[in-house]
Amino acid sequence: MSCCGGNCGCGSSCQCGNGCGGCKYSEVEPTTTTTFLADATNKGSGAASGGSEMGAENGSCGCNTCKCGTSCGCSCCNCN
């Protein structure tokens, strides 16, 4: 996988400008893991939460394409 030579990595030709770090952007962000603990004695009358709502990885980017925004920003990225 190419990280677009330091470009933002948006679009098919990776020409959104430089200084964005390309795919290396995700390496500088701290990786955090959030764990939710449910009370086993919860007496709620609603439907049980089945864990089907998982956050997307890599900055919650859920798309396969990148769109160049202002200042070389990507409004929708999936840079694994």
Curated annotation (Swiss-Prot):
Protein function: Metallothioneins have a high content of cysteine residues that bind various heavy metals.
Name of this chain's protein: Metallothionein-like protein 2B
Lineage: superkingdom: Eukaryota
Inducing stimuli: By heavy metals.
GO molecular function: metal ion binding
Gene: MT2B
UniProt organism field: Oryza sativa subsp. japonica (Rice)
Alphabetical list of Pfam families matching this protein: Metallothio_2 (PF01439)
Family: Belongs to the metallothionein superfamily. Type 15 family.
Keyword entries, A-Z: Metal-binding, Metal-thiolate cluster
Tissue-wise expression: Highly expressed in stems. Expressed in leaves and rachis.
InterPro entries: Metalthion_15p
